[in-house]
Regions:
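A beta-strand edge to alpha-helix "cap/lid" segment located at domain peripheries
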Residues: 2-31, 36-125
Length: 125
């Protein structure tokens, strides 16, 4: 059975976020992120793959649950743009929420995340 583009990238996103929940699954993150991965975080920091793995190894990303919605995918040959909203929770409280854009590239028959950009969503009162 062949997955639709939406199904494929929804599964990749699910795997990506699940790898960041609780104790990070560094092997999965290393596999999903391209070596030239670059993230522009909601706080304005620019972080490469090594920098992000270092943050996770140092337990500087305390998240036990990530929820997502408003998922959309646009695929262009060997590149896909995935947008959505993600909320990051710890100990039953929402820590922050972002609108995110993911850039995926198919290299050597494997989809990997090459870019991430997050924009903070203000907390509602």
């Amino acid at each position: 059975m062949t997955l639709t583009d939406d199904e494929l990238f929804k599964e990749l996103e699910r795997e990506l976020f699940a790898a960041h929940e609780g104790t990070p699954d560094l092997a999965t993150i290393d596999r999903l992120y391209a070596d030239d991965f670059l993230s522009t975080n909601a706080d304005g920091r620019v972080v490469d793959k090594k920098g992000w793995l270092d943050i996770l190894k140092a337990s500087q990303f305390p998240v036990d649950r990530i929820t997502t919605d408003d998922f959309k995918v646009r695929k262009y040959s060997d590149t896909a743009i995935v947008t959505g909203r993600s909320a990051y929770h710890y100990a039953g409280k929402k820590l922050w929420e972002v609108r995110h854009t993911q850039v995926w590239a198919n290299t050597s028959g494997r989809w990997q995340l090459v870019g991430w950009q997050g924009t903070s969503v203000p907390h509602e009162a």
